[in-house]
C-alpha cells in the first residue's frame, strides 16, 4: 500500500504519495490547486493537481469524472499526457500530468513572437485539434494559458475541464471571452468543433500582432470588436439565432463592411498567414475551415505531413453526459476509472516526434525566452 505525506500548500492540505517530492505551487487550474512535483519513479517533473471538493455535489463529481475519462482517452503528442491518478486516505483525488516549462500567455506577455514561432505553434495547435475533433470532443476553452510549451518548442493543449460534445450554455469566464466564438455569444442552442477553430484563429492573430485581437470588456463590447473587423453577421448566421433579445441586439448594430485582415497585423506578415487567418476567423461556423483542412494550408506546408497527423481510434463515449446521477454514484464511477487506470501500466507520451523531419530550430525558444526554462531538472 502506498505511503502518503501530508503538507499544507497555500492554505490547502495536500496528501500525496511518497513517489512525489519537492512540491511547489504553480497556480490554480480548473477546479483545483496545481503544484509542480518531482516524480521519483520517472525522474521527471509533473504537474500535480488536487481536485477541489470533487464530491461536494453531483455536478462537481460529474465534472471530475468527465475530466478523468477524457485524460485517459485522449492520447496525442500535442495534448497534455496523464501520468498518474490516485485517491488519498482523505478521499481527495489527485491527477498528475506532464509538466512543460511555460505557457503561451507568458511568452506573449514578454515580447511579440518571431514569425517562425507563430507558424510552428499554430501548426501544433491545429494538429492537436484535428485529433480532439476526430474523437467528437470540443475543447471549448482554448486560450494562451491552456497552451503549454517547453524549451524545445514542443506544444501541448491542456485543461479539458470544460470539454464537451456540445453545450448550449456558454461559460462566463472573462479570461476566455477574447477567444470565444460568435455562435456562443449569439446563444445558439447547439454549436460544434468550429468554436475551437475560432479560438485558434484568435490565438494566431495574437501571436502575429503581439496583443489580443478582440479584447472585449464585456459580451456586447466583444461582439462590437468582432464586427468592426469582420463586418456584420451574414443572413445564414441570423437565421440560427433563437433568442429575441439577441436578434434585436444584432439588428441594432450599425452597418459594417469587413476589413482587410492585412491591416490588423504587421506589414511584413506572410501572405499565407493572413489567408489562413481569414479562413479561421469566419463568423459563420458552417464555412469556417476545419482543423484537417487548415493543416493542408500553404502557410503550414513546411510542417504538414498527412502520415503524421493522427486521428483518434474512435469517438469518445459521451453516454454519461446526459446522466443525472447522485454524487454517490459518480463517486463509485470515478473510483472505478481510477482503479482501471492503475490496473495497467501508465502510458508514457514519450518525446515529441515532430523534430525528426521538421525544419524548425527546436532550441530557438530556449535562447529567446531562457528565463522561463531555468528549473527544468529535478532536485539535486
Swiss-Prot record:
GO terms for molecular function: ATP binding; MAP kinase activity; protein serine kinase activity. InterPro entries: Kinase-like_dom_sf, MAP_kinase, MAP_kinase_CS, Prot_kinase_dom, Protein_kinase_ATP_BS, Ser/Thr_kinase_AS. Dually phosphorylated on Thr-171 and Tyr-173, which activates the enzyme. It catalyses: L-seryl-[protein] + ATP = O-phospho-L-seryl-[protein] + ADP + H(+); L-threonyl-[protein] + ATP = O-phospho-L-threonyl-[protein] + ADP + H(+). A motif (TXY) lies at residues 171-173. The modification Phosphothreonine is found at residue 171. The active site is at residue 141. ATP binds at residues 26-34, 49. The modification Phosphotyrosine is found at residue 173. It holds the Pfam family Pkinase. Mitogen-activated protein kinase required for growth on media where sorbitol or mannitol is the sole carbon source. Belongs to the protein kinase superfamily. Ser/Thr protein kinase family. MAP kinase subfamily. HOG1 sub-subfamily. This is Mitogen-activated protein kinase mpkC. The lineage of its organism: Eukaryota, Fungi, Dikarya, Ascomycota, Pezizomycotina. The gene is mpkC.
Amino acid at each position: 500500500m502506498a505511503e502518503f505525506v501530508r503538507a499544507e500548500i497555500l492554505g490547502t492540505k495536500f496528501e500525496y504519495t511518497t513517489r512525489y517530492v519537492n512540491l511547489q505551487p504553480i497556480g490554480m487550474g480548473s477546479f483545483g490547486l496545481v503544484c509542480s512535483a518531482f516524480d521519483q519513479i520517472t525522474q521527471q517533473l509533473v504537474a500535480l493537481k488536487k481536485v477541489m471538493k470533487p464530491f461536494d455535489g453531483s455536478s462537481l463529481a460529474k465534472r471530475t469524472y468527465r475530466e478523468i475519462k477524457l485524460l485517459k482517452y485522449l492520447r496525442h503528442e500535442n495534448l497534455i499526457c496523464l501520468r498518474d491518478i490516485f485517491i488519498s486516505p482523505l478521499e481527495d483525488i489527485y491527477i498528475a500530468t506532464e509538466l512543460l516549462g511555460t505557457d503561451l500567455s507568458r511568452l506573449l506577455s514578454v515580447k511579440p513572437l518571431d514569425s517562425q514561432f507563430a507558424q510552428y505553434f499554430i501548426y501544433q495547435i491545429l494538429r492537436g485539434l484535428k485529433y480532439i475533433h476526430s474523437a467528437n470532443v470540443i475543447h471549448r476553452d482554448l486560450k494562451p494559458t491552456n497552451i503549454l510549451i517547453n524549451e524545445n518548442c514542443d506544444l501541448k493543449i491542456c485543461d479539458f475541464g470544460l470539454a464537451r460534445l456540445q453545450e448550449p450554455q456558454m461559460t462566463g469566464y472573462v479570461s476566455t471571452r477574447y477567444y470565444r466564438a460568435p455562435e456562443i455569444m449569439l446563444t445558439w442552442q447547439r454549436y460544434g468543433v468550429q468554436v475551437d477553430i475560432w479560438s485558434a484563429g484568435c490565438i494566431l492573430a495574437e501571436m502575429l500582432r503581439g496583443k489580443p485581437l478582440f479584447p472585449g470588456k464585456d459580451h456586447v463590447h466583444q461582439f462590437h470588436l468582432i464586427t468592426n473587423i469582420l463586418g456584420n453577421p451574414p443572413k445564414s448566421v441570423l437565421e440560427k439565432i433563437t433568442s429575441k433579445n439577441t436578434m434585436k441586439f444584432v439588428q441594432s448594430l450599425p452597418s459594417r463592411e469587413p476589413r482587410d485582415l492585412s491591416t490588423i497585423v504587421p506589414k511584413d506578415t506572410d501572405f499565407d498567414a493572413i489567408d489562413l487567418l481569414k479562413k479561421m476567423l469566419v463568423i459563420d461556423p458552417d464555412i469556417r475551415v476545419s482543423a484537417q483542412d487548415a493543416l493542408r494550408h500553404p502557410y503550414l506546408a513546411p510542417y504538414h505531413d498527412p502520415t503524421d497527423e493522427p486521428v483518434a481510434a474512435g469517438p469518445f463515449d459521451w453516454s454519461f453526459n446526459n446522466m443525472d446521477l447522485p454524487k454517490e454514484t459518480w463517486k463509485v464511477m470515478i473510483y472505478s476509472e481510477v482503479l482501471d487506470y492503475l490496473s495497467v501500466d501508465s502510458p508514457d507520451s514519450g518525446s515529441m516526434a515532430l523534430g525528426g523531419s521538421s525544419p524548425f530550430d527546436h532550441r530557438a525558444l530556449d535562447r529567446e525566452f531562457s528565463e522561463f526554462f531555468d528549473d527544468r531538472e529535478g532536485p539535486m
